[in-house]
């Protein structure tokens, strides 16, 4: 059975949806008896410093040909295409969301990320995505063939005990505070039901201070 390396930029213990997904993926692979080694890449991705890009290239190019490397899309989409093309290990891409679709990117940077991610995905033996929507984006815009895509939907563990009813109800929205998460859509919808009593909490790091 091939050894698996999992390359993730930054601290995998970070409390965000993407990192929680990564941790659960690593856990499930371990429960299946797979040997998995975590490779921590620099935390500057998707805009890596020269040092972080160089360190990542050295670590990834050193992986043996009889191994598998899963690279989180936050890093893979911004990597030098020549480095990715030279990988000896079998590449599996994990794409949470295409980098070029993030908000607040100028045209030049958006085009650069789109091109690098499209090229790098072309080298992946398999691509893991969290939703059919992301899968369709990669098929239609990034030339990823459907037979290479695995949709692994995220989920939550079933809670113990019986949930208590709250009055008024609490509406909880969890996710990083950036435009594509749509917290503003939720707030506008809630503003239209002022005749009802409710509480709402938005929980997640403010990665876009102006939006938050």
Regions found by a protein language model. Name each.
Residues 71-76:
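Short His-centered aromatic/hydrophobic patch
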Residues 156-158, 162-181, 187-192, 200-203:
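Conserved donor-binding/catalytic core segment of Leloir-type glycosyltransferases
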Residues 99, 108-127:
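Membrane-proximal helix-turn-helix segments that form the acceptor-binding/catalytic region
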Residues 42-60:
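N-terminal beta-loop-helix "entrance" segment that forms/cooperates
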Residues 199-212:
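Glycosyltransferase donor-sugar binding loop
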Residues 1-43, 63-67:
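N-terminal subdomain of nucleotide-sugar transferases
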Residues 133, 152-155:
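Carbohydrate-associated surface elements
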Residues 67-70, 84-102:
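Active-site proximal beta-strand in glycosyltransferases
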């Amino acid at each position: 059975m091939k050894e698996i390396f999992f390359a993730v930029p930054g601290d995998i213990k970070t409390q965000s949806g993407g990192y929680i997904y990564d941790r659960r993926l690593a856990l499930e692979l371990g429960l299946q008896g797979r040997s998995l080694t975590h490779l921590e890449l620099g935390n500057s991705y998707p805009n890596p410093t020269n040092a972080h890009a160089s360190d990542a290239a050295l670590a990834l190019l050193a992986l043996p040909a009889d191994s598998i490397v899963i690279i989180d899309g936050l890093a893979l989409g911004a990597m030098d295409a020549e480095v990715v093309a030279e990988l000896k290990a079998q590449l599996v891409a994990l794409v949470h969301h295409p980098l070029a679709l993030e908000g607040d990117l100028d045209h030049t940077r958006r085009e650069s990320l789109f091109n690098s991610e499209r090229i790098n995905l072309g080298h992946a033996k398999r691509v893991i995505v969290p939703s059919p929507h992301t899968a369709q984006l990669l098929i239609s815009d990034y030339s990823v063939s459907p037979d290479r895509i695995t949709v692994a939907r995220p989920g939550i563990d079933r809670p113990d005990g019986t949930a208590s009813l709250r009055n008024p109800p609490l509406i909880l929205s969890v996710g990083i505070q950036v435009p594509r998460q749509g917290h503003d859509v939720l707030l506008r919808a809630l503003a239209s039901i002022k005749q009802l009593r409710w509480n709402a909490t938005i929980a997640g790091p403010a990665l876009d201070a102006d939006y938050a």
